[in-house]
């Protein structure tokens, strides 16, 4: 990799909604730019979710070095701060080896924490955390709306973020929004980001989401959920909340038929992709290029070349 003339070191970033073609673009960029692909997806960190998280398969992983994929056990939650610390080390190692770090994923919170920093929230009282985590999500959402109206905009289904906001207000006496206004620890001032925000046509993306889940069933998703459930893990763990786990579990327990299971998982995937699409359309810096085309092989090749050139001339 050529040395940048900038005092900042180059980092490529490929982000966007699920099923948008990010992984294929990242691997192609790694091949032509001597890069290392670094995962920035909250589900793909878990070893137990290779299929349902749509991790690159072994053949894809063999095409370029991959880091932070499947490196966590499902019993071990991976917070944004945890991941950011690991990502900093992975980026530093890639840089030390003379390779281009390539961040790829759809978890905006992970990327925002790494680049712009994290709220310096004090350690949460363990008793308060246990109390909050024991609440049904509906009760936690109602309590949050009453105790911290500033965070009342969280969706009732967003159990993890609701619990986090509630434990923060109860433990610190201040809203999570207050702490989030005082971000620290980001590496944005140290790196030159060459970014591609992938936002393909919505109809194409929805069809890809539906087809992807059908393919996951053929690739072993049912057995993956069976093995995960056999471990008897806390159902509130992030890995247990991953799209597809609850739907397949309900089918395995005879609560719904297969057709309903597929429809529910596909709908959940589309809804998640819609939220990601909205976030990545508006939240990243305006200077980061948006890609609004379908990522076929030809487009992937052209975008990869542009990203390589952007990264190596920053």
From Swiss-Prot:
Catalyzes the transfer of a dimethylallyl group onto the adenine at position 37 in tRNAs that read codons beginning with uridine, leading to the formation of N6-(dimethylallyl)adenosine (i(6)A). It comes from Rhizorhabdus wittichii (strain DSM 6014 / CCUG 31198 / JCM 15750 / NBRC 105917 / EY 4224 / RW1) (Sphingomonas wittichii). One of its GO terms (biological process) is tRNA modification. ATP binds at residues 16-23. HAMAP family: IPP_trans (MF_00185). This is tRNA dimethylallyltransferase. InterPro entries: Dimethylallyltransferase, IPT, P-loop_NTPase. The record marks 107 as: Interaction with substrate tRNA. Substrate binds at residues 18-23. The keyword Magnesium applies. GO terms for molecular function: ATP binding; tRNA dimethylallyltransferase activity. Keywords: ATP-binding, Magnesium, Nucleotide-binding, Transferase, tRNA processing. It catalyses: adenosine(37) in tRNA + dimethylallyl diphosphate = N(6)-dimethylallyladenosine(37) in tRNA + diphosphate. Its EC number is 2.5.1.75.
